[in-house]
Design a protein with these regions (language model features):
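Bacterial Sec-dependent N-terminal signal peptides
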Residues: 1-60
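Glycan-recognition and catalytic cores of secretory/periplasmic carbohydrate-active enzymes
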Residues: 59-545
């Protein structure tokens, strides 16, 4: 692509109702200032994508339809998988390179002013006195602090909010200071005589985001020493507790992340050790456990390991788990499944719900799998959860949430609804003070989503697989920087306009996902419709011939 054309991407409807834009009728409050939709299920009409590129030669544009991006080349501009890992299909930009606009910005502003942004004022686990993560005491040393920091920190970087960034650094500086001579960092928690690494798994993600934003080399040193400690830990002491064992795939991703920066061979050995000691999510007709968050978060572990094993059976296993849980417990709108806290036979109808943690972890898994596989299925599924399920779990001002949200959610009260709901407690009520894990973990949802609105492709181009208003600075071709502006109210409207700005002429490919729910889509450049049959569930690859 060069620079000053207009591209129109036209996606007329199928003759069927779909649930992608299902909006709950819960409150007259409309913080996004967007017209309310009147129907629970809407008939898709038309999606229009306008694309402005600053050039004059339209007939030099070539559009092809592809199942996946071209991985025969290696991206020269961003850190990506190095051998022996399989090539990534898409590469995430560093946090902060994508700026939200429109409703995505409004949501982050609401989150900043809401529960996630002010959780430190009401959460005992974020109390800075006697806090194990700050080294001021021995309390609150498990998952809550890093859960909160995942969303809060990334929101701070995206908004470039100096006060929030300083608050984030307060916690991370304590993490740096906590590293022991043997490499372990953070509060040391034992369960059954073994170290519990689950809280540290989350914190390593916080550190990765901080490195992307700041370039602070202390992150690399800390993680290198910590993973050497993990490698030296006897296998009968490694990942044996329920949570860390179920979610070892998060550790595996962090190992890959560091390996792609340093190339240290010991990390490949540790990756094998991590996979070996993680719960088996490769079973054909059952799961290692039926906990909703474990499933939403851990079903991607086989596909993550596929990056190292290159065994297609590992990749297929992730798809199998995704469909297995939904074939039994997921015959409901919104992309999720009934597991409130755990999925149970006999409780398979729309009254069953999912934790708010389950929503955001499913979105994160979809985003990761989009990068690993390039399959547009994961982008579309992420949109489904993000637009239909996740918003229903919170009040419109994002100042309160509930633990369990069901597709057929007819009541929000503080009663115990067990055994209809698996977990005992007041878990259908909106409450800023309850739901300990979701209270801290919910904040990752929108920041992570925004970070995936624009991706880099292996062939030094740009990919847009999930749509939303934003502006991104992206390095393309041989390192030239372009700005891509996505102007849209999607999914509340059905048009998307792209403008690409550069200082010099530059050629690069652009991938646009063609949703499965459209008939006869088209692309128009500067008002002229391109003569090309687009295919649903694939990508339009636009390039200069």
């Amino acid at each position: 692509l060069l620079t000053n054309n207009l591209l129109l991407f036209n996606l007329p409807s199928k003759d069927k109702l779909v649930d992608l834009y299902r909006i709950r009728d819960r409150s007259s409050v409309n913080p996004l200032k967007i017209p309310r939709m009147k129907k629970v299920n809407l008939l898709f009409t038309i999606l229009t994508v306008m694309f402005s590129l600053h050039t004059t030669a339209q007939n030099n544009m070539k559009v092809t339809i592809v199942d996946r991006p071209d991985k025969s080349r290696e991206n020269n501009n961003y850190i990506t998988n190095r051998a022996p890992l399989q090539p990534l299909s898409f590469i995430k930009l560093p946090v902060g390179d994508i700026k939200p606009e429109g409703w995505t910005l409004k949501l982050l502003e609401l989150q900043k002013d809401g529960l996630n942004g002010h959780l430190g004022e009401i959460s005992a686990w974020l109390d800075k006195e006697n806090n194990a993560w700050l080294g001021t005491g021995s309390d609150y040393g498990w998952e809550e602090v890093p859960y909160w920091l995942k969303g809060y920190g990334n929101m701070a970087y995206i908004l470039n909010d100096k006060e929030m960034i300083e608050e984030t650094k307060t916690w991370l500086e304590a993490v740096f200071k906590s590293q022991r001579e043997d490499g372990y960092f953070g509060p040391y928690i034992e369960k059954n005589g073994r170290p519990d690494l689950w809280g540290n798994m989350i914190m390593t993600w916080c550190l990765q985001s901080y490195y992307e934003f700041s370039g602070d080399e202390r992150v690399i040193d800390l993680l290198t020493n910590y993973f050497k400690w993990q490698l030296n830990l006897p296998e009968d002491m490694f990942l044996k507790d329920y949570w860390e064992n179920s979610r070892g795939g998060d550790n595996l991703l962090s190992i890959y992340w560091l390996y792609n920066i340093t190339g240290d061979d010991f990390l490949i050995e540790l990756a094998e050790k991590t996979h070996k000691n993680t719960a088996n999510w490769r079973q054909r007709s059952t799961l290692p456990n039926w906990h909703n968050v474990n499933i939403a978060q851990s079903f991607r572990e086989p596909a993550t390991y596929y990056m190292l094993s290159a065994d297609s059976a590992d990749l297929i296993s992730t798809y199998n788990v995704h469909h297995l849980i939904r074939n039994i417990f997921g015959q409901v709108p919104g992309g999720m499944f009934g597991a409130d806290e755990n999925a149970r036979m006999g409780y398979i109808d729309p009254r069953q719900g999912t934790e708010t943690c389950g929503f955001v972890e499913q979105m994160a898994s979809d985003e990761i799998l989009l990068r690993l596989t390039g399959d547009p299925f994961w982008a579309e599924h992420c949109e489904n959860v993000a637009f239909n399920s996740y918003p229903a779990s919170m009040m419109p001002d994002l100042k309160s949430l509930r633990y369990i949200t069901s597709p057929n959610h007819t009541i929000s009260d503080s009663r115990n609804h067990h055994p209809g709901i698996d977990n005992r407690g007041p878990f259908l009520a909106m409450n800023p003070f309850s739901s300990r894990c979701c209270q801290h973990n919910h904040g990752q949802g929108w920041p992570y989503y925004i970070e995936h609105l624009v991706l880099a492709s292996p062939d030094n181009g740009i990919a847009v697989a999930m749509y939303g208003p934003c502006t991104a600075n992206v390095k393309v071709a041989d390192g030239k920087e372009v700005k891509i502006i996505e102007d849209t109210n999607y999914p509340f409207e059905e048009s998307v306009k792209f403008t690409i700005q550069t200082n010099v002429k530059v050629a690069f490919p652009l991938y646009l996902r063609i949703p499965t729910w459209t008939d006869n889509p088209s692309i128009t450049v500067n008002g002229v419709k391109l003569d090309l049959l687009l295919e649903n569930g694939k990508y339009a690859r636009i390039e200069k011939e």
